[in-house]
């Protein structure tokens, strides 16, 4: 089997381990993509420019003409679909706040159940958080084993080393998981939308207060600009750490007295940090689950720096906590049986794993 794509002159070929033979998940699940040093760069034979890869109709690039359209049609199509999404998710099952690596992994895992409506709120125009690059603006992404099994599932190629794998560019992970996630009909990503506050009923989080991110950033320069709301059975807070938008979910819980403190993350310790983040991903108050680096903020555990496996697995664990809260089958209760049952690894400090 030939892996799709070539990396900087190095062909990537699948390496199949005996432990993964017979996997029933997606076509490349259980296949490790490793660099083959003897491989030669091969240029695919591309057809002449045509109207479609599946059509013999040729382009005339000197006289290319698009079909005519009214400008109002473009406006109407965008507006109608967005408003329909807002109406659909005004009362939704799960709201994921923050579309970084943990939030995207959580939403991806949730989206496997087509009956669960998932809304993702991201204050930036560009989702992905810090997962577009590795550390110090370098390109490569390091993922410690056994979290590489999640990469196998979503078919991200990597170079396999002894205790970890390396993705040649972090954007391969982020773009791949987004393309798979957003193609699913039960998921909507709301870019450039900020979660300004929480909806609280009694002692339970029941949704989020939303606004356009540019409005949220300019309340001090304009007159009153009231928000919107999104009710949800479960809110997953994956707001990361540091900065004005970091850990906003747990900081708000502290300000209203629902939790005692948010001590902030400790100094870097990769080995302690990743295990702790996955282990302590949890429902901190009824209706609100915390995942990713926001866990380190609320627990005062170490930061982990530029290694990303805990973000992926913490996101998966948060998804199964949300399914549990919804009363649905989940991996934590051992009754998870989706149509496609990928291998799931829940890392912990004592190296316990749950396999599919």
From Swiss-Prot:
The keyword Ion transport does not apply. Binds 1 Fe cation per subunit. The modification 2,3-didehydroalanine (Cys) is found at residue 224. GO terms for molecular function: cysteine-dependent adenosine diphosphate thiazole synthase activity; iron ion binding. Gene3D superfamilies: 6.10.250.2840, FAD/NAD(P)-binding domain. Its cofactor is Fe cation. During the catalytic reaction, a sulfide is transferred from Cys-224 to a reaction intermediate, generating a dehydroalanine residue. It catalyses: [ADP-thiazole synthase]-L-cysteine + glycine + NAD(+) = [ADP-thiazole synthase]-dehydroalanine + ADP-5-ethyl-4-methylthiazole-2-carboxylate + nicotinamide + 3 H2O + 2 H(+). One of its GO terms (cellular component) is cytosol. InterPro entries: FAD/NAD-bd_sf, Sti35, Thi4_fam. Its EC number is 2.4.2.60. Residues 1-50 form a transit peptide. Involved in biosynthesis of the thiamine precursor thiazole. Catalyzes the conversion of NAD and glycine to adenosine diphosphate 5-(2-hydroxyethyl)-4-methylthiazole-2-carboxylic acid (ADT), an adenylated thiazole intermediate. The reaction includes an iron-dependent sulfide transfer from a conserved cysteine residue of the protein to a thiazole intermediate. The enzyme can only undergo a single turnover, which suggests it is a suicide enzyme. May have additional roles in adaptation to various stress conditions and in DNA damage tolerance. Homooctamer. PANTHER family: THIAMINE THIAZOLE SYNTHASE. Belongs to the THI4 family. This is Thiamine thiazole synthase 2, chloroplastic. It comes from Physcomitrium patens (Spreading-leaved earth moss). The lineage of its organism: Eukaryota, Viridiplantae, Streptophyta, Embryophyta, Bryophyta.
């Amino acid at each position: 089997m030939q892996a799709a794509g070539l990396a900087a002159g190095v062909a990537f070929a699948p390496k199949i381990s005996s432990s993964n033979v017979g996997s029933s998940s997606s076509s490349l699940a259980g296949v490790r993509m490793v660099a083959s040093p003897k491989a030669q760069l091969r240029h695919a034979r591309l057809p002449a420019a045509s109207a479609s890869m599946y059509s013999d109709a040729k382009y005339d690039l000197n006289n290319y003409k698009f079909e005519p359209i009214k400008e109002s049609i473009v406006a109407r199509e965008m507006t109608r679909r967005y408003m329909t999404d807002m109406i659909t998710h005004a009362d939704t099952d799960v709201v994921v706040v923050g579309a970084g690596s943990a939030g995207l992994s959580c939403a991806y895992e949730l989206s496997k159940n087509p009956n669960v409506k998932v809304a993702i709120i991201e204050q930036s125009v560009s989702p992905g958080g810090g997962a577009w690059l590795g550390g110090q603006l370098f390109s490569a992404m390091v993922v410690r084993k056994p979290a590489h099994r999640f990469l196998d599932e979503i078919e991200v190629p990597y170079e396999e080393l002894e205790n970890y794998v390396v993705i040649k560019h972090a954007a391969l992970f982020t773009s791949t998981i987004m393309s798979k996630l957003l193609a699913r009909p039960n998921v909507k990503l709301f870019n450039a939308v900020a979660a300004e506050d929480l909806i609280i009923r009694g002692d339970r989080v029941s949704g989020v207060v939303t606004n356009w991110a540019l409005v949220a950033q300019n309340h001090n320069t304009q007159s009153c600009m009231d928000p919107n709301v999104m009710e949800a059975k479960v809110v997953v807070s994956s707001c990361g750490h540091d900065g004005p938008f970091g850990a906003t979910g747990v900081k708000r819980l502290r300000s209203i007295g629902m939790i005692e403190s948010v001590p902030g993350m400790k100094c870097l310790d990769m080995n302690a940090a990743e295990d702790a983040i996955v282990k302590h991903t949890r429902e901190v108050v009824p209706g609100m689950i915390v995942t990713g680096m926001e866990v380190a903020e609320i627990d005062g555990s170490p930061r982990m720096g530029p290694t990303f496996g805990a973000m992926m697995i913490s996101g998966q664990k948060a998804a199964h906590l949300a399914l549990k809260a919804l009363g649905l089958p989940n991996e934590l209760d051992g009754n998870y049986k989706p149509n496609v049952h990928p291998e799931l690894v829940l890392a912990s400090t004592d190296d316990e794993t749950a396999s599919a």
